[in-house]
């Protein structure tokens, strides 16, 4: 399931991904999911900052059938995550509690301030996929090149 979410993230963020994760999945998927988030976030951080010539802010509302999830983010290099995804149990063999673990690891290591808000939805798969897509599209919009901006901060540093 995480592979499917990462493929969706890659497609909608326009960030090419090739990930191979070998972990202690004989215990559970927690460490592997968290580690993928840490590495992906760290690499995005290296690619973005000092964030010169990009928009910096991004938002996206993504609808997937009955589910609607909004992501608003700031490439501020001041990490913060708020989320209100209402999912529990499993999607297939994937523990839905790991969605928060992934986003927390990814967002904090990327240096992003993000609010991921479920506006509606009842199908866990749809809610989670809409969340991944909303983060992806918001990142794509925040990283649009704009050479007129310079460093997108009045402090001239991020």
Model segments located where?
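N-terminal intrinsically disordered, cationic/polar leader segments
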Residues: 1-158
């Amino acid at each position: 399931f995480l592979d499917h979410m990462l493929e969706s993230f890659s497609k909608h963020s326009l960030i090419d991904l090739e990930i191979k994760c070998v972990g202690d999945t004989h215990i559970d998927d927690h460490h592997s999911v968290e580690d993928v988030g840490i590495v992906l976030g760290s690499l995005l951080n290296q690619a973005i900052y000092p964030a010169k010539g990009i928009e910096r802010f991004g938002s996206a509302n993504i609808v997937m059938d009955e589910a609607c999830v909004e992501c608003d983010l700031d490439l501020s290099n001041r990490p913060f995550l708020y989320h209100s995804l209402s999912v529990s149990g499993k999607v297939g063999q994937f523990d839905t509690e790991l969605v928060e673990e992934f986003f927390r690891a990814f967002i904090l290591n990327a240096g992003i301030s993000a609010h991921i808000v479920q506006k509606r939805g009842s199908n866990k798969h749809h809610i989670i996929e809409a969340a991944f897509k909303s983060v992806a599209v918001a990142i794509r919009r925040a990283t649009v090149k704009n050479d007129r901006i310079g460093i997108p901060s009045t402090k001239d540093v991020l």
